[in-house]
Amino acid sequence: MSLQFVIGGSGAGKSYQLYQRVIESSLKEPKGKFLILVPEQFTLQTQKDLVTMHPKKGIHNIDILSFLRLAFRIFEETGGNDRLVLEDTGKSMIVKKVMMEKRNDLILFGANVKKQGFVEEMKSIISELAQYSIHTDELQKMKEVAKGKPLLNHKLTDIMTIYQAYEEFLQDKYINSEEILDLLCDVIDDSSFVNDSEICLDGFTGFTPSQYKLLSHLMKKAKSVTVTITMDESQINRKQEEHQLFYLSGKMAEKLTDLAITQKIEIKPPILVASENGGYSYRFHNSMALSALEKNIFRYPYKSFTEEQDDISITAAKDPMAEARHAVIEITRLLREEEYRYKDIAIVSGAMEVYGDIVKRELELAGIPCFVDHKKNILTNPVVEFLRSALDVVTHNFDYEAIFRFLKCGLTDFTMDEIDLFENYVIAFGIRGKYRYEHEWERKYKTNYEVDLEKINYVRECILKEFTPLYETLTSKKSSVRECVNALYNLLCTYHIEEKIHIFVEKFKAQGEKEDKLRAKEYEQIYRMVLEIFDRMVELLGEDVLPLKEFRDILDTGFREAKVGLIPPSIDQILVGDIERTRLKDIKALFFLGVNDGIVPKANPGGGILSDAERQLFADHEIELSPTKRQTAYLTEFYLYLNLTKPQNKLYLYYSKLDVSGKSIRASYLLGKISKIFPKLKIYDADRKSREDELLGTDQGLSYLISVLRDYEGEQPKLWREVYHLYVSGQIKGRISLDKVLQGVFYQNYEQGLTKEVARKLYGETLLGSVTRMEKYAACAFAHFLQYGLSLEERQEYKISMPDIGSLFHEALERFSKALKELDISWHELPEDVRISLGERCVREAVENFGNGILESSKRSAYLATRVERILQRTTKTLTHQLQQGVFEPGSYEQYFSHADRYLNLRGRIDRVDLYEQDGKLYVKVIDYKSGSTSFDLMNLYYGLQLQLGVYLSAAMELMKEQYPNHEIHPAGVFYYNLDDPIVTKSSSVEEDIEKKLAMNGLVNASKVVVPLLDTSFCGDEGELAPSTKSTVIPVETGKDGTFTKRSSVAKEEELITLTDYIKDLMHRFSEQIMEGKVRHNPYRAKNRNACTYCSFQSVCGFDCKVSGFSYRNLKTLNKEEVWNLIKKEDEFFGKDELDTGATEGN
């Protein structure tokens, strides 16, 4: 029985020498037993190393084990453990359950039970207590230490409550993995497995109390125990302080020595690896700089390395993406110029959640194979999403989100067309709740396409049929966990999930790409993992009856804990991993990314359930727990030392100036320490380095070539021309086709339009149009084509939009106007009480008749209905005032009209037409109600963007000529009335201020006869207009001399007639162009607005003014006089080809 240490710094060759001695001894003693104990994650690599080193390429009498594997090997021999080992998933489930059961007994933690992450925290503290052999008695001692500290006492009381309930649950059925070694110590004396064996321990930086206890037993039974210790030989006999680099190693050696002395075990002189090799460093024989780093980093005092060297470099980059990009450029150089293999290179970071995907993407762009070493969370896997969304369907009673998460997980039997059709219907009618799914859906919503109710109801019936058993089981207050799990399993079987997953696996394998192989391995494991979680729930909680939400939370905890471990699909590839977790072996170059403050060392935002001060208090009373933050900081330096000294030839350190969100960040203190050791070490700026070495990186080089071709004006430099010819000649090949790249770089938009035949097939022989359609064409011909040619439309949603509110106002106003007519009450004589009661009734009827019942479905909708009533009351009051201010009476409401010519059959409705008859003359006033804040703009009318009022005036006059053939028809004006209930500042004349804000805007006949008919306040002496008058109902005011001011919106009667003729001709021209197949991208741009701003088709039209061939149609800004002059010269306009209204093209 003996104990011996193998001592040396990182890279000295401790493992190599240890394994060499074991192999030699095993060959000399073929019947001897040799055990090598390593950390769990190192077992596979150690086996590979030994097989490679062994002359017979086999390890017949050498066992490579972890502590847990050793325990199970001995249990097979002695028995002693009939209990199931509880892994993290099961542990989390039990912790969640006992916390829920005990939440009313908890003093501090009761409110945290449902907080995400708290189960993990509590599970962590329970594991820690078990790992350090702390049970109820020890917790009681901890409470005595905490006397006088109420907060800590309450914490410990709650921990005891949960821990006791946890241990009671386990009883004789389960055992924590942390307690396995304690159990092993109880039975190891009955085992002969380790008797007279030679035991070697390698790769450990320290041991837990349970492991030390086991080692004391092993020392007594084994022939010898040999332990590798990472430490400078000069530090062997020196006591290590906590802040020193080798404190952990020294503490481990000291404890093992004490165990040996206590048991009177022989302690052999240590094997000093470096001394035996004559000071020769096994790992760093090619790099004096890396050898100097190993000897001096985190040492006090340190020795500076003053020679020039390029084995260690520091590079500053703009952000993590720039770090990764520059690292990949250097990797490409190493592969090309220094003939490195992929497996010789590793990339590590302390923030894999940031760098993992970025590095992977850059390596793939460069065509470099890589393996990202991390355990993948299974929450995003389709099978888990299938189950979680199914649970949510029941938990949230068939709400939209849960239903469509389920349908879109990719494992149902519905086609995407069926799902899309079904989703459109559900959204259009706001369907939620199981009750709605139990009744056939018969209503249709407004759309350009036929609503296929048969298909929609088929999907509804399938969902209802397949979910009813699950719903009934999960919502029953009598269902046990076993029954609930069975119901979920039956759902998996109903949808044949196992078979579908098998098809996915075969598909991924057939595709053959590395990423597909990894996905195949993930999918191969997932179904088994899900069933194991089900089994664990049934084992642990089988006959318990839990509330649905609690059942879901516990199962979800299981899913969150589960991770898929993936094995690299190839040996020769770059390893990308975490600085602490990833095992690096025999690498020549190490790229360390993200060497920034907060990552190295890693920021610790919280101290867990027990704070640092509380842990230190227990440490002062010799109660050992996990390290404090301060101790962890020292440990981090030791782990950094181990990883920085892994490469044999090159160490590349990178840091960012900005984080991924663009915030400024600092470099890590580590770089300062390295710079002091290497005073001649320069920090490179990745942003300033030449791009010449970026060229030949397959897809990556191609991406840089693209940027140069796009951005460089004039002749490209010779270097880039040569690179271009390399790609063209095929000497460099990437996954991206150069032809496709060039098509994108030099793409120009050429638009030929449609043929007349195609246009007629799309639109018919005659356009069935509205004013809105013509305005859409005037704004952009392509947008018109998408909406009216291809019949694209926005998805109907179960909500109230501005157009809906406008429709509601219109209907309520129409009902109000008709009711007045039925009651034979004139607007001029409308009593206030009748107006108010009638308004309430009309809004109520409009709401009841509106759409799909949405106004009755939520508090917000009910509020909107109230708001509509308030605005209607204000509108009827204002309209009454406006009519009473003049002499006109409403002649018709919602007046239908149509107009047909060669290409266009125009149809529409005029909200209101007011009439006044005098001396055989009929004056016509047109009003259009708007729910927004629309203002009349003569320039917009000229360009075709605002045609409504002109079209309505023309149509109204035509209708009146038919109805009153013996009268002269005269236009009085056209107006927008904006439906609103404006807020005004408090003043003595609130009503007057509101009336001014609600005054109609539009265009008024400038006749001195007509204006007083619209507003009698303009009645002056002897047929003249009253001077210095401003109307509160129409856009007219007069100056001191009785003439119109510039602010008045007036036109002569002949100008109004010319305007209506111009609009007719303009729409004729538009319809002619549409039928000729004009569909060009030509959105207008005027001042600070353009046609694209509120366009519904931005995501599909492809318009990009940066691309050649696309440009805006810039509208020239015109004043009123210029517009009238142009309208009068309409022949000049209509002689031109397209929408050429003096507009110019430009980006």
From Swiss-Prot:
Signal peptide feature range: none
Cofactor annotation remark: Binds 1 [4Fe-4S] cluster.
Amino-acid positions noted as binding [4Fe-4S] cluster in the UniProt annotation, renumbered to this chain: 780, 1092, 1095, 1101
Requisite cofactors: Mg(2+); [4Fe-4S] cluster
InterPro entries attached to this UniProt entry: ADDB_N (IPR049035), DNA_helicase_suAddB (IPR014140), P-loop_NTPase (IPR027417), PDDEXK-like_dom_sf (IPR011604), PDDEXK_AddAB-type (IPR038726)
Single GO biological process annotation from the record: double-strand break repair via homologous recombination
Annotated residues for binding of ATP: 8-15
Top class in the EC scheme: hydrolase
Recorded GO MF terms: 4 iron, 4 sulfur cluster binding; 5'-3' exonuclease activity; ATP binding; double-stranded DNA binding; helicase activity; metal ion binding
Keywords: 4Fe-4S, ATP-binding, DNA damage, DNA repair, DNA-binding, Exonuclease, Helicase, Hydrolase, Iron, Iron-sulfur, Metal-binding, Nuclease, Nucleotide-binding
EC numbers for this chain: 3.1.-.-
Role description: The heterodimer acts as both an ATP-dependent DNA helicase and an ATP-dependent, dual-direction single-stranded exonuclease. Recognizes the chi site generating a DNA molecule suitable for the initiation of homologous recombination. The AddB subunit has 5' -> 3' nuclease activity but not helicase activity.
Misc: Despite having conserved helicase domains, this subunit does not have helicase activity.
Subunit structure: Heterodimer of AddA and AddB.
Family classification: Belongs to the helicase family. AddB/RexB type 1 subfamily.
Official protein name in the record: ATP-dependent helicase/deoxyribonuclease subunit B
Protein source organism: Lachnoclostridium phytofermentans (strain ATCC 700394 / DSM 18823 / ISDg) (Clostridium phytofermentans)
Gene that encodes the chain: addB
